[in-house]
Amino acid sequence: MMGAMGAIGEFVQDRTYESYQTDLLFRSAVERQLEILGEAANRLKPEFQAAHSEVDWSNVVGLRNVIIHQYDEIDYEEIWAIATERVPLLLEQIQPLMSELTEEGGVVAPI
């Protein structure tokens, strides 16, 4: 999860929404990392998610599902806002939890 959020941060740094709209490679890279982030969140044990309900896990996973299954309905403006505004906030929420995630029992698969 940290890798995906870090990559998104690097990708959007010094870029504009206009470049996101017009650059297919850039847009695809951001969307792929959001997919990875959502899949990693989906692999967390329900007990871990419940213990950290301050994180909106369902939205993280839900976005992954929209990108993968409803790709023709993606709202680019919303994805841009998520990548530039919500992912940095999510990073702040998840970073303190990383020690728990790397201990046995935090995840069901590597993140």
Locations of the language-model features?
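Solvent-exposed interaction patches of small proteins and small membrane subunits
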Residues: 2-111
